[in-house]
């Protein structure tokens, strides 16, 4: 029914948490699980070789002079999927019990629509100006921990159980993964545009194309995940809590590519979801 997919780059300690939580906390915990590890030099490849049987992983250890990045890695994984649904995740996520079933239940409520369904998320305040927004709750670092070695998973599971039982509403918004989508609909839209590799602006480009193709975006409160906060792209711990040079360069370059492709800046609605291009 579902294939879990993660594309990762030098994010081993968080990848370990993500993989373990998917196999331990998912309702569909025995589903296929694809890992795309690109240009990793931090021991990720070795860990996957040692643990792929333990976690029943289909691993692809990729080396590319021109990186695919997260978006391209999602495309890579999706091409390997043979199930009806794809469940994309980032390597800096921790998923809570039955997070995937809640997304599938939401998907099943709208059987005749093309959907992108995301989990509600909680993340530590890794940037001074970080604030909660629709679909994302920002908490102080000490609330649940902020790093792989101080994360309070048991406490967060208790919080998640309370949050998901007391809240039941949907936000009409798309977020970066975790995202549940039918494989046929991913193929129809063509996945992420390689123009924006290796990172940045690709989510907005994908969502805008989805909007133009009649997709509906749903972010329910019944599925909750922990997001360590841009560890897979910004490389905070390697750069004294500053975004990596690769990320900053990609953000600048891809902003120029965005304007070349779309001809104007994005326009957002009250949920901070892209709704079009400024004319």
State what each model feature region is.
Residues 86:
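Short aromatic/hydrophobic "clamp" motif used to bind/position activated sugar donors
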Residues 145-183:
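A recurrent flexible, glycine/aromatic-enriched loop bordering the glycosyltransferase active site
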Residues 64-81:
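Glycine-rich, basic loop-to-helix element that forms the pyrophosphate-binding segment
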Residues 103, 172-190, 195-224:
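A short, conserved alpha-helix in the catalytic core of glycosyltransferases
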Residues 125, 131, 207-279:
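Active-site-adjacent helix/loop segment of glycosyltransferases
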Residues 20-30:
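Short, acidic, metal-binding catalytic loop of nucleotide-sugar glycosyltransferases
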Residues 37-46:
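A conserved acidic beta->alpha catalytic loop
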Residues 94-147:
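Conserved donor NDP-sugar-binding/catalytic core segment of glycosyltransferases
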């Amino acid at each position: 029914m579902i294939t879990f997919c993660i594309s990762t780059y030098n994010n081993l300690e968080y990848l370990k948490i993500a993989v373990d939580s998917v196999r331990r906390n998912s309702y569909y915990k025995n589903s296929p699980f694809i890992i795309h590890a690109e240009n990793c030099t931090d021991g990720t490849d070795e860990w996957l070789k040692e643990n792929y049987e333990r976690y029943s992983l289909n691993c692809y250890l990729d080396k590319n002079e021109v990186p695919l990045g997260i978006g391209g890695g999602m495309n890579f994984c999706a091409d390997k999927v043979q199930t009806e649904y794809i469940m994309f995740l980032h390597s800096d996520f921790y998923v809570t019990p039955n997070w995937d079933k809640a997304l599938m239940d939401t998907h099943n409520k709208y059987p005749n629509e093309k959907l992108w369904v995301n989990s509600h998320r909680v993340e530590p305040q890794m940037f001074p100006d970080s604030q909660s927004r629709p679909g994302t709750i920002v908490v102080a670092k000490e609330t649940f921990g902020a790093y792989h070695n101080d994360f309070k998973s048991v406490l967060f599971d208790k919080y998640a159980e309370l949050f998901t039982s007391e809240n039941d509403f949907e936000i009409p918004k798309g977020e970066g993964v975790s995202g549940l989508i039918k494989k046929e609909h991913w193929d129809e839209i063509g996945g992420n545009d390689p123009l924006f590799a290796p990172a940045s602006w690709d989510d907005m480009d994908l969502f805008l194309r989805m909007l133009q193709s009649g997709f509906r975006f749903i972010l329910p409160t019944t599925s909750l995940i922990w997001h360590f906060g841009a560890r897979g792209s910004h490389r905070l711990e390697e750069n004294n809590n500053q975004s990596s040079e690769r990320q900053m360069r990609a953000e600048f370059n891809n902003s120029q590519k965005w304007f070349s492709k779309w001809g104007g800046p994005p326009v957002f609605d009250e949920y901070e979801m892209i709704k079009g291009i400024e004319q």
